[in-house]
Amino acid sequence: GLGDVYKRQEVDIKEAVRIHFRDIGQDESVHDVTYENGQARERTQILMDIANKNNGMVIGTGDMSELALGWATYNGDHMSMYGVNASVPKTLVRHLVHYYADTCGNKELSTVLYDVLDTPVSPELLPPENGKIAQKTEDIVGPYELHDFYLYYVMRFGFAPAKIYRLAQVAFEGQYDNAVILKWLKTFYRRFFSQQFKRSCLPDGPKVGTVAVSPRGDLRMPSDASVRILSLIHISEPTRLRRIS
């Protein structure tokens, strides 16, 4: 693995971030978006500088699900020198990691990968609670299996929200009730529109599936597109359907 070629290195960002917070007048006890993003951007700066130092490149870890929802810090983990996972949805990432853990033949590596799979998805930008991860992504933005379902039918077929809502009711029957499906469908559209500005300046990356959100590929969308326009036309349809379902 890469760890056999390159020396493992851990860089503590605490002091650098604290100095930065003091410089901009950020209260460290206020765990707001500045508190979170300051850490994310410090991580990226370190990675970029280490890459320069070693004549290398920063490989982005963000996947298509995160890009669709804008679940990335602008100029933080949003930025890299090559976004290798840019067209791989989060649900597929899990399967790929599990497959490699099963087949790699390296027991030590497999143990680490299984542990990663058992860990809640999180940017870990907030202090832990009782020694456990407090910031769980799917508690905040919703289940990735729902969002990946929505994304596929939006990008591959261009279906309207009402149709996607009906399809999700069938696909996830017994797993999510109608109210939950509707809640996260609205979240998906709100974030998909409002976060286009992050996708408009994505690093290069491959397209490996049937859909992608790169501005140089499948998705050409203005950053100032308003979800309000869509909501006036379509987003109320699932609410009407919920009343009659």
Segments from the language model and where they lie:
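ATP/NTP-dependent adenylation/nucleotidyl-transfer catalytic domains that generate, transfer
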Residues: 4-232, 236, 245
